[in-house]
Amino acid sequence: MIQQESRLKVADNSGAREVLTIKVLGGSGRKTANIGDVIVCTVKNATPGGVVKKGEVVKAVIVRTKSGVRRNDGSYIKFDENACVIIRDDKGPRGTRIFGPVARELREGNFMKIVSLAPEVL
């Protein structure tokens, strides 16, 4: 469960290392986000020479959470960290590589480019 002021690692090579959540998109008064949800965040830590700079406001999709998500068959999938991928307005990633596994729930949100770039889909 990701909410305002949550810090997440960035799982792509866009140049950002860590982001801070500003807002959870999808309805007024929505408090929390889970895997596959889009958030607005600001870059808190970035690598030099990257596409994304520190202080920039970006949109991102959540790909891993510690709290996990429940699947239709009753199983749960949880990860060791909270991570996101920075996206453009057309739901495509800003970077060209994705690091670490991503959840299968991203397919339902039409983030097919992220799923295809990921080394592992759980």
From Swiss-Prot:
<dbReference type="Pfam" id="PF00238">
    <property type="entry name" value="Ribosomal_L14"/>
</dbReference>
<keyword id="KW-0699">rRNA-binding</keyword>
<comment type="similarity">
    <text>Belongs to the universal ribosomal protein uL14 family.</text>
</comment>
<dbReference type="GO" id="GO:0003735">
    <property type="term" value="F:structural constituent of ribosome"/>
</dbReference>
<keyword id="KW-0689">Ribosomal protein</keyword>
<dbReference type="InterPro" id="IPR000218">
    <property type="entry name" value="Ribosomal_uL14"/>
</dbReference>
<comment type="function">
    <text>Binds to 23S rRNA. Forms part of two intersubunit bridges in the 70S ribosome.</text>
</comment>
<dbReference type="InterPro" id="IPR005745">
    <property type="entry name" value="Ribosomal_uL14_bac-type"/>
</dbReference>
<protein>
    <recommendedName>
        <fullName>Large ribosomal subunit protein uL14</fullName>
    </recommendedName>
</protein>
<keyword id="KW-0694">RNA-binding</keyword>
<dbReference type="GO" id="GO:0006412">
    <property type="term" value="P:translation"/>
</dbReference>
<dbReference type="GO" id="GO:0022625">
    <property type="term" value="C:cytosolic large ribosomal subunit"/>
</dbReference>
<dbReference type="InterPro" id="IPR036853">
    <property type="entry name" value="Ribosomal_uL14_sf"/>
</dbReference>
<comment type="subunit">
    <text>Part of the 50S ribosomal subunit. Forms a cluster with proteins L3 and L19. In the 70S ribosome, L14 and L19 interact and together make contacts with the 16S rRNA in bridges B5 and B8.</text>
</comment>
<dbReference type="InterPro" id="IPR019972">
    <property type="entry name" value="Ribosomal_uL14_CS"/>
</dbReference>
<keyword id="KW-0687">Ribonucleoprotein</keyword>
<dbReference type="GO" id="GO:0070180">
    <property type="term" value="F:large ribosomal subunit rRNA binding"/>
</dbReference>
